[in-house]
């Protein structure tokens, strides 16, 4: 089995299982309670992992507010296949955990120096190797992935998701064949089914439901 952190994902989904509209607008369809839950889940993580598109769409700083008194600020890990990042983005200009940039398929002439000069650590390797490195070299025991869908799909293809946290917003329906789900746009099936058990079910008065699912590890005997 691969050496990697325990990996959690956290998403808000609509009644019809969408994470955003067809236009990929930022997900602002949930309540303040959902934001509070997001931050509580972040406090469990040694590192946060997002795709570059999600980082830019949601204007994330990938931090935990000081008033929540986090023991640490998690490492901030951002994935871009070609390794292009916007140095004016606030993630490079806010106090927080060290920024780790993963270019999983860099072009031959790739130059990481501008990002290194901005204080980031740049990795050029496949996602599976990056996960191994986070666990073995950076002591990341718990990694929280906050999207987007293509990154979650890549984790699912590696069978590298241990816990799924969802805020199910039953008050909102987006519809649309092209609106993304937690694994992105509709596409081919995963290589194999992944079995999860519902471990937390918490309906709120506002039409939202907090759900947690744990990966069931089937014995391979």
Explain the meaning of each model-derived region.
Residues 1-221:
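Enzymes that bind and transform nitrogen-containing heteroaromatic metabolites
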